[in-house]
Amino acid sequence: MSYVIDRRLNGKNKSTVNRQRFLRRYREHIKKAVEEAVSRRSITDMEHGEQISIPGRDIDEPVLHHGRGGKQTIVHPGNKEFTAGERIPRPQGGGGGRGSGKASNSGEGMDEFVFQITQEEFLDFMFEDLELPNLVKRHLTGADTFKTVRAGISNEGNPSRINIIRTLRSAHARRIALSGSSRAKLREAKAELLRLRTEEPDNFSDIQEIEAEIERLSARIHRVPFLDTFDLKYNLLTKQPNPSSKAVMFCLMDVSGSMTQATKDIAKRFFILLYLFLKRNYDKIEVVFIRHHTSAKEVDEEEFFYSRETGGTIVSSALKLMQEIMAERYPINEWNIYAAQASDGDNWNDDSPVCRDILINQIMPFVQYFTYVEITPREHQALWFEYEQVAEAFDESFAQQQLVSAADIYPVFRELFQRRLVS
């Protein structure tokens, strides 16, 4: 007898494969809908699914059929209106539509196909082909991670991991092996008893002897236990090394008085998108939140996104604090260090060259990637031009982009973290 063991991850959801095939087929429609959803959603509404509409004309299956036009001779049974040789006028073309015109008794069409993608699928499409650039495998002593995988069957294990089917199968095989000869003798004894009762009903001594033998064999068979400790089988799980990269992301946000509420909202959206991306795609990553005005301080996630504290503008305070935290907690030989900075570009004039020097001399030589987004519809100011010098010196690990409105967040985010081809 053969056994089929279904170890697919989606074994209980048989339609998952078909759904994945469908999502691959209409990937362009879904990606476009996801991009539109990201640009219109609120700050706290980034992790929900989305309703996708696909035009009916795009879901038609290719079929073989007769082409339009041409001449055909067709006999319609039961037709009393026309006779042989008469020409039937072509029907007027009609089509369904969704316009605002008057109702009609002709024409037909097809509504758009609408379906829902889950939260997981939404985030998959949102962060598709994105990654942290220049991520290097850096080893930490004693910090290896492991994942639990199935490694067959064991005779010992935790009762919660008992494999019932394999246990019963083993017990059945053991009972057959231990009682096989007794069962064969029992069948022979029963056949002999039936013969004696039929052919020699008066031979009481032999009949009693056979009956005693049957009882003895039956007792021997029943003494074989239904289940023995030898039969117990357990699912064996082992820990498999799972190499991982240690990374830290510094999030630096300007909350000075020059940042309007709309500008702060765009900055928060950018960082929430970054935060979701990091938490979803990387198991071993730490996030350091830094808010700054005239002074900078490290805060938790709640205060970073929702604190109302404000003040003047000295951008270098955030960079100095970042450098101090790097030196204190994140050795460069063990950590991949990343940073993302958001500001409206306003800064105390004498401070912008200081920011450039800190980046070039104290931060950029030790980080994998640094991104700067300037949120302003106006012309760039001194800070942007100082950062351009940083970009020239570190063209592979420094990037800067401008955000004008919330609609620019997702395209700029994808451009900053687009997966790069490695030659």
Curated annotation (Swiss-Prot):
Annotated region (Disordered), positions in chain: 65-108
Coiled coil segments of this chain: none
Pfam families, per database record: DUF444
InterPro entries linked to this entry: UPF0229
Entry similarity comment: Belongs to the UPF0229 family.
HAMAP family assigned: UPF0229
Name of protein: UPF0229 protein Pmen_4018
Lineage, opening ranks: Bacteria, Pseudomonadati, Pseudomonadota, Gammaproteobacteria, Pseudomonadales
